[in-house]
Amino acid sequence: MTTLIVSSNRIAQYWALTKPRVTQLAVFCAVIGMFLATPDLPDWKIVIAATIGIWLLAGAAFAINCLVEREIDSRMARTARRPMAQGEITVPQTLVFSGVIGGAGMWVLYNFVNPLTMWLTFATFVGYAVIYTIILKPATPQNIVIGGLSGAMPPALGWAAVANDLPMQAWILVLIIFIWTPPHFWALALYRRDEYAKSGLPMLPITHGTAFTQFHIWLYTIALVATTMLPFAVGMSGLIYLVVAAVLDVIFMWYAWQVYRHYTDMIARKMFTYSIIYLSLLFAALLVDHYLRF
């Protein structure tokens, strides 16, 4: 019984390294991209293989992130319980784990999907685990903006998996997530600013102040609203998406305005939480509209 408990705890620790909640949202957006890439239903074998491969490589990237930021995580209440921050998993163990699941993901994508998706997903891995985590995040308060492309790539990965191509429509999906990322993370950085100050990371509220950050959340929100209209503007989606996007955008703008003009930590926290719901519902609306367009 003791052995089973220890094994279960170890599995849970490795699972936590992959940041499962973040991975789930990324993979969800990738799956939506798979369905939007074809007017019919995509091949279920491709969907399953691509989902597994993208999930594995995303998990590998997040494991490297946990490794690199283990000391920073230990100084922040939000992240102090992560396995690397707690010293529950060693550096060699994390490297091996990331290498194994990342390699497995590449193998699945190459053999059961297509080389384009494998290389794009690998490039996304490098973009997040190396360029963003190691280079940009500790160096500039614009880390979220510059490094946001890697986090925005999942729908393009899904599209490439099914179509073996990346047309304009796929990049519109990437652009939506790219513009969504700064207000999403800056809302978190605002109400967690004391923790980020202890971490040593140059997050925007620390380097430029809260008022500057609040204003830029509002600016990016305006840009996001305009960007979410692109699928309808180019004929990629219809009225169902337009109506849902408009409602979601109005709520997002309300939160952003409150953060900008009537700031409290509570409203920033609510905006951060809503931004996750927002992105999920926005992509779900794209999927529903794709098959029920009128």
Curated annotation (Swiss-Prot):
Can you name this protein? Protoheme IX farnesyltransferase
**InterPro entries from the UniProt entry:** Protohaem_IX_farnesylTrfase, UbiA_prenyltransferase, UbiA_prenylTrfase_CS, UbiA_sf
What GO biological process terms does the UniProt entry carry, in alphabetical order? heme O biosynthetic process
> What is known about what this protein does?
Converts heme B (protoheme IX) to heme O by substitution of the vinyl group on carbon 2 of heme B porphyrin ring with a hydroxyethyl farnesyl side group.
- Tell me where it resides: Cell inner membrane
Sequence similarity: Belongs to the UbiA prenyltransferase family. Protoheme IX farnesyltransferase subfamily.
What's the miscellaneous note?
Answer: Carbon 2 of the heme B porphyrin ring is defined according to the Fischer nomenclature.
Q: Which UniProt keywords apply?
A: Cell inner membrane, Cell membrane, Heme biosynthesis, Membrane, Transferase, Transmembrane, Transmembrane helix
What is catalysed by this protein? heme b + (2E,6E)-farnesyl diphosphate + H2O = Fe(II)-heme o + diphosphate
Q: How does it sit in the membrane?
A: Multi-pass membrane protein
> Which residue ranges traverse the bilayer?
22-42, 46-66, 89-109, 116-136, 143-163, 170-190, 211-231, 232-252, 272-292
User: What are the EC numbers?
Assistant: 2.5.1.141
* One Pfam family, short name: UbiA
Which HAMAP family did the record assign?
Answer: CyoE_CtaB
Q: Name one GO cellular component term.
A: plasma membrane
The protein's annotated pathway: Porphyrin-containing compound metabolism; heme O biosynthesis; heme O from protoheme: step 1/1
This protein's superkingdom?
Answer: Bacteria
Q: Which GO terms describe its molecular function?
A: protoheme IX farnesyltransferase activity
First-level EC class: transferase
Q: What is the gene called?
A: ctaB
